[in-house]
Regions:
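Transmembrane helix-loop-helix
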Residues: 63-87, 124-145
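Membrane-proximal helix-loop-helix units in multi-pass membrane proteins
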Residues: 83-132
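Short juxtamembrane and helix-loop transition motifs at transmembrane-helix boundaries
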Residues: 37-47, 67-75, 94-102, 122-130, ...
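Hydrophobic core of alpha-helical transmembrane segments in multi-pass integral membrane proteins
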Residues: 11-22, 62-65, 120, 135-150
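Terminal transmembrane helical module of multi-pass membrane proteins
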Residues: 125-180
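C-terminal ends of transmembrane alpha-helices
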Residues: 23-31, 88-103, 142-159, 177
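Small-residue-rich segments of transmembrane alpha-helices in multi-pass membrane proteins
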Residues: 42-45, 108-122, 164-178
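N-terminal topogenic module of multi-pass integral membrane proteins
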Residues: 1-68
């Protein structure tokens, strides 16, 4: 029987994809492109919505990562460290809005989270056998390409940011499925 700690990541993925896509769709301005965090920081109601999504989904992913994936995978310490970078970055991004005096700190924690996401995907590639490892390599390379695009094409940042986040979610789901 599969333990209950297997399922929260699937719920988190559904919520995250739905809620973050909705936020981007409703608030994105083609004339003034922004990151998800910058869009959320424009209004208090959007910031609250963004915080709830990050905290809830991050915590649901944490349940699956710490209590299902980490105990079953090769290199559990490295996986736990990479996940912790992602999780702490995620929680911190929700606290520090992407505006004004806090913008530089927000950017630092966003980069910490991105490093955690990308590291996790590559570690899954190394730690998972067969087809699952191959899928993780595809996710890792696609995420790397998106990071390069985010760094070089700031005008379309949000269009690279969302797939990067969703590929990270997919990477976690593949790892959970491989370890069930």
């Amino acid at each position: 029987m599969i333990p209950l700690t297997f399922y929260p990541a699937f719920i988190a993925t559904l919520l995250s994809v739905t809620c973050l896509s909705r936020l981007a769709w409703r608030t994105h301005d083609k004339q003034q492109p922004h990151t998800l965090s910058e869009l959320a920081a424009t209004e208090l109601s959007l910031l609250k919505y963004f915080r709830i999504v990050l905290w809830l989904c991050g915590t649901l992913f944490a349940i699956t990562m710490y209590w299902f994936v980490v105990p079953r995978i090769a290199h559990p310490v490295l996986i736990a460290v990479a996940w912790s970078l992602e999780y702490v970055g995620n929680l911190t991004l929700a606290v520090i809005p992407a505006r004004g005096k806090t913008m530089s700190w927000h950017t630092v924690f966003a980069q910490v989270m991105a490093v955690g996401m990308l590291s996790l995907a590559y570690l899954f590639w190394i730690g998972l056998p067969g087809v699952y490892g191959g899928l993780e390599l595809v996710f890792s390379l696609a995420m790397t390409m998106l990071v390069i695009l985010m760094a070089t094409d700031r005008r379309r940042f949000i269009f690279y940011e969302l797939p990067f986040i969703f590929l990270s979610h997919g990477s976690i789901l593949v790892a959970a499925l491989a370890l069930r």
